[in-house]
Structure formats: C-alpha cells, structure tokens
Amino acid sequence: MAALAGFAANSLLCRAALRPGEADAATFTTIRLATGAVTLWLLARGTRAPILGAGSWRGAVALFAYAAPFSFAYLRIGAGVGALLAFGAVQTTMIAWALRSGERPRPAEWAGLALALGGLVVLVSGGLSAPDPAGAALMLAAGTAWGVYSLIGRASVHPPLATTAANFARALLLSAALSAAAALWRPPHLTARGALLAAASGAIASGIGYSLWYAALRGLSATRAAVVQLSVPLFAAAGGVMLLGETITPRLVVAGVAIVGGVAVALASRRDRRPSNPRPAV
C-alpha cells in the first residue's frame, strides 16, 4: 500500500506545486527526474546492481515523454482527473500492444476494455464539468508514454532498479534541454516550497515508491499486481479532495467507476500464463 500511495503522491505533489505557481512545469520535471535519478542510483548501489550499461535511450525517451506532459497537464486539470486519464491511457496502450502481439482477449476482457474506454469518453466529453481539453490531451499522452516505457522495461535483462536509475539519468538530459528551451520563452520560476515538492516527487514518490513496488512484486502474481494498481486513481482523487481542496463531480465518479471497474473485469478474467515484470502505475 505504501508503494501505491507513492504513485498517487506524484499526482498530488505535482498539482500542489504547479497549481499555485510554486514552480514552472519544466523546472519541476527537471528537479523530479534529477532527485529520482540520484535516489535510484543510491538504492541500486546499495544492492550492488550494475548501473553501467543498464537502461536504454528508448526507455529514457519514453520516460521523458511521460514526465514532461504529466507536469504540463497538471497546470490545467485536477489530481483525480489526471490520475484517471493517465491510468486509462496506460492500460489501453498495454492492451493494444497485447492485441498486436497476437494475444486473443476473452469476451470478458473485451467487455472490460469497452467499459473502461467508455469511462474515458464520459470523462473527456464536452460540458461544463469536462476537464480542460489541452490538459486532458497532455495527460493521455503522458499515460501512453508510460505504457510504452513499461513495455520497453519488460524486455530489460538488467535489474529493475539499475534499469530505472539509468533511464532517469538519461531522461534528465532531455529534461534539462527542455528547461533551457522553456527559459528562452519565459523565465523559470521556482520557490523553496516548489523545489521541496519537486524533490519529494522525485526522491520519495518516484525513487523510494518504485523500489517498494519492486520489492512487493516478489510476492504478487502478475494479475494481482495489476489489480492492486486500480486503487491509485482513487488515492489521487481522495488526496486531491482532502489536501488540495478539489471537488468530486458526478462526471468524475461515473468515469472513475467505469474505468476502474472495466479494467478490473478485464484483469479478473485473465489467468497468468507466464511470469512477467509489470511496471508501476502513474
């Protein structure tokens, strides 16, 4: 549960820093990746996992393509809505890849996927309570990129901590370039509180949260590991209400039930066919 709370905390910390203007999105992303890289490097060193040669530029690009839109999206949408959008995009991406790879879903899986996609449509469809279109598009892009990153990571032969540490370090270079480019358009903005929130997102919610998740995976089947992640958007929505003063709209409730319920139906019908190494949620 601590690892899952860490994943939800990423949404809350990002929103808490960006909504009141404690940091600009590019700077927040760079600090998050930097502190995450350092934390993961220290954790990997502690396990003596070889970092040199681990990871890949493909993985780093996918990680950056998740982290940057994730931050910019939270300038426009709430924590609960963002987590639901990202979660739906991650699952849709991975299911689409499974179909492309020749996996034949069962009828219940098709029904669950249709229900989850219907929930996404409800969430982003027009109306006064619909999320900002640009913010929703950015978060869907972030979720898709995280799904791609997860698929890339499944093929890694290196220890997960070493792979993630190396990918964070490479993605940091891309984020630094983004920050430099953004500074040409608008001066960077960062308060002490914004820096603290970004560092907490990178070091604790991402670095320590991921390490706890990898440890938990040893005692979970692939299906159970996927099912327990269904609570992450709910944690984020609850945290947004209690800590950030966000409101829960009927649209969010209906969409949340449809998305989480749909994926639960799909996953409950699937039995583990081979060992796998799923990655953590947004």
Residue ranges and their predicted role:
Residues 26-42, 112-115, 134-141, 152-207, ...:
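Hydrophobic alpha-helical transmembrane segments of multi-pass integral membrane proteins
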Residues 6-9, 47-87, 95, 115-116, ...:
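Specific transmembrane alpha-helical segments of multi-pass solute transporters/efflux pumps
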Residues 33, 230-282:
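C-terminal-most transmembrane helix of multi-pass membrane proteins
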Residues 1-30, 61, 65-69, 118, ...:
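Glycine-/small-residue-enriched transmembrane alpha-helix faces in small-molecule transporters
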Residues 17, 28, 32, 73, ...:
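Hydrophobic/aromatic residues within transmembrane alpha-helices
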Residues 1, 52-62, 103-116, 136, ...:
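Cytoplasmic-side transmembrane-helix entry/capping segments in multi-pass membrane proteins
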Residues 27-38, 63-64, 71-104, 142, ...:
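Specific alpha-helical transmembrane segments that line the substrate/conduction pathway
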Residues 40, 63, 105-125, 142, ...:
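Hydrophobic transmembrane alpha-helices of multi-pass small-molecule transport proteins
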